[in-house]
């Protein structure tokens, strides 16, 4: 299994893991858990879920997640 996309900085350090879903798929805890499992090996500081209708972004802080109100700009990653 693998994630759908990773955003990297110019030093090729991973900044954000992205999991895309179909518009008919609700962004549930199960979907979030899938991204979190992928991140166990990658250790990316941000997780994003998107189904084309809504997006959820969470910052990973010491094995806890802080949900963000909006998708950060690339320059702010």
Model regions: which residues?
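A short, conserved, highly charged catalytic patch centered on acidic carboxylates
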Residues: 1-46, 53-77
């Amino acid at each position: 299994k693998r994630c759908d996309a990773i955003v990297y900085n110019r030093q090729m350090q991973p900044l954000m893991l992205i999991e895309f879903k179909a518009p008919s798929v609700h962004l549930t805890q199960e979907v979030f858990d899938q991204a979190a499992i992928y991140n166990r090996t990658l250790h990316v500081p941000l997780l994003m879920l998107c189904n084309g209708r809504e997006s959820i972004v969470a910052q990973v802080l010491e094995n806890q997640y802080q949900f963000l109100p909006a998708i950060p700009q690339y320059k702010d990653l």
